[in-house]
Amino acid sequence: MAGSALPLPPPPPLSLQSPSQNQTRHSSTFSPPTLTPQTPSIRSRLSKICQDGNPQLARQLFDAIPKPTTVLWNTIIIGFICNNLPHEALLFYSRMKKTAPFTNCDAYTYSSTLKACAETKNLKAGKAVHCHLIRCLQNSSRVVHNSLMNMYVSCLNAPDCFEYDVVRKVFDNMRRKNVVAWNTLISWYVKTGRNAEACRQFGIMMRMEVKPSPVSFVNVFPAVSISRSIKKANVFYGLMLKLGDEYVKDLFVVSSAISMYAELGDIESSRRVFDSCVERNIEVWNTMIGVYVQNDCLVESIELFLEAIGSKEIVSDEVTYLLAASAVSALQQVELGRQFHGFVSKNFRELPIVIVNSLMVMYSRCGSVHKSFGVFLSMRERDVVSWNTMISAFVQNGLDDEGLMLVYEMQKQGFKIDYITVTALLSAASNLRNKEIGKQTHAFLIRQGIQFEGMNSYLIDMYSKSGLIRISQKLFEGSGYAERDQATWNSMISGYTQNGHTEKTFLVFRKMLEQNIRPNAVTVASILPACSQIGSVDLGKQLHGFSIRQYLDQNVFVASALVDMYSKAGAIKYAEDMFSQTKERNSVTYTTMILGYGQHGMGERAISLFLSMQESGIKPDAITFVAVLSACSYSGLIDEGLKIFEEMREVYNIQPSSEHYCCITDMLGRVGRVNEAYEFVKGLGEEGNIAELWGSLLGSCKLHGELELAETVSERLAKFDKGKNFSGYEVLLSNMYAEEQKWKSVDKVRRGMREKGLKKEVGRSGIEIAGYVNCFVSRDQEHPHSSEIYDVIDGLAKDMRGDSFLTTLPTVTPSLELDE
């Protein structure tokens, strides 16, 4: 058994020449003599050839030896490892076991082979070597034990819980443990998430009078950062300072200490460590810049970046520029982005692809997707990341059609779609509510057998937004409890809310809690709109309390959702209180509050908050302008609204969308300036060919009794009716005819709707009782007590038809009610 070969997989193809080719090439300098293991210079020659980076020549020399000794086997194995060919090193070990069973392996053989196993992460081979050394090597040295520990640490993953103790067992079997063994053990505990134990073992090492090395601190600092104790961090860092310059000047230790304090949220201490470092390399600079970026100290990160590139002592690398690009992206300032782009271009003869990709991301996040596309088009060479970056930029900026076209072009250019491309495709399908593209993408995933983390949540979200909630439900139920992660639960909750199934929203939320899946900010932000839909402030308050207990109420998305919920539920005072208590505000928070003011007819407050938002340095986006224009419309602030509309185009360079045009049309129509609204829409030309825009105009005609204009608008709307359900507009026109008692016209409209197969959308009502939501649809029979409910309704209807009740009713004009 001891002499059996390793169970090795086939090696990857060598990027080396065949022996015959090499023999020809080196014929002038090398002709293998007849060698024996006793040739004095053979080991040194073999070692020298490997050191010179010519492992193929070393192999030819080794193959010429009839019976290599253990020392020569060790030399060739180590030589191939040093030349980054660990797979081939393992093959030499296997060959040694097969062809030279009587050649004894020593400590160097095993330690070298175990190193090759660690580098290839070949656990099966590593275990085989472990068995070999147990059978063949009676007294393993510390070098072998250290290599064995390192192999297991490298090959085992954190989830391999059944082999948690194997590293510890090897460690405990060592008679004399040096600092290398302790370091490996500490790193293993950190890797497997046992950070407290890692810190404890460091303390035991100190008590055993084993002096820690710089690597000891590099390994233990990440464990200290997880402890959330700055006091403990100060103790470990203070110990490192006491040990002297060898540790203080070690730049890996410095970088690790900077990261440790940053993870604890103590940025000032990170900066103190950085400033105390006299000789810094680029890794130390990058670590400190990265700390600033990750903690949103964006101005400081850019200042430090400028200081780094201005230093004559160091040369900035790609990571430095990537970190700076991330900072500029987060600041979302296009002008700063342009300056950074120009600066980077001056510092590189030819920009590396990775930096060009980061420039595309930067422009995209600054809201200048056309600049991103310009960078993309200027690239001489693109990789799959370049294509995915540009596709994602289009989708994230609302240019979903352009993103889809680029996917098609990407395939034409010979690039394969990966999971990142698929996520962009699914997002585009969700945004466009395009179920066909979504289904095709889903089918592609199934055909290609592609699986990636979060795939189910993307699919559920896509089908939900496309109105195919039943398919979403099937995917959710088919996944099983074990496979459902937090994102999957959130997608299903959000899907039910978006499709108006509020009772199922709360049902899934309860099941989520029962399965001990901890809700996060996305969960709460997804479920709060359901409270708005049923108008339940009490249920909203319960969720507000839940978010406070879970420390989620100050999350910017949860805070915005709470403001929105209270506003839509009619509790505008609660919405104001929530807004004022929110410490961190972004454009979403402001937009939600502005929208709330608008819905409650508080247009002046909405405009005041809009101005306050601008003064605070938060740039309003397209949605913010929709909110403030809506507020002006609801409050009749026409002049103010038109002024803001012009400001949007000229100052913020935001191109109006159909929603902005609808706001202006509605704004003019509400105050009776219907003809002016009509001229505005007509003047838009091709941009005005939007059903919602003309539908808004039709609503204004209904409000002010402009029947003649309504007929003109209806004719225009009919041109948009390409198999879509525009029953709402038809009903509106029919009701106008009914008010004018033009019954023939009413009948004509109804007949036309029936011929088209149009139906009035069914009304849906909900009521929350004792924490449970009961939903009702017109003529619904699904409720278990529907017969009793309809009996009560019939009784109420009879009472309402009584003489005493009818005398209190005003005279009304009949309106169109279609059969459901």
From Swiss-Prot:
GO cellular component, one term: mitochondrion
UniProt-recorded Gene Ontology molecular function terms: mRNA binding
Targeting signal (transit peptide) range: 1-50
Residues covered by region (Type E(+) motif): 771-801
Type E motif: region residues: 693-770
Region Disordered: start-end pairs: 1-42
Protein location: Plastid, Chloroplast
A Gene Ontology BP annotation from the UniProt entry: chloroplast RNA modification
Keywords: Chloroplast, Plastid, Repeat, Transit peptide
TM region(s), chain numbering: none
Coiled-coil residue windows: none
InterPro entries to which the protein is assigned, alphabetical: E_motif (IPR046848), Pentatricopeptide_rpt (IPR002885), PPR_At4g14850-like_plant (IPR046960), TPR-like_helical_dom_sf (IPR011990)
NCBIfam families xrefs: PPR
Bias (Polar residues): 22-42
Protein's recorded name: Pentatricopeptide repeat-containing protein At3g22150, chloroplastic
Protein family (similarity comment): Belongs to the PPR family. PCMP-E subfamily.
Entry annotated with the keyword Chloroplast: yes
Swiss-Prot/TrEMBL PPR repeat ranges: 69-99, 106-136, 141-177, 178-212, 213-247, 250-284, 285-316, 317-347, 352-382, 383-417, 418-452, 485-519, 520-550, 555-585, 586-620, 621-651, 657-691
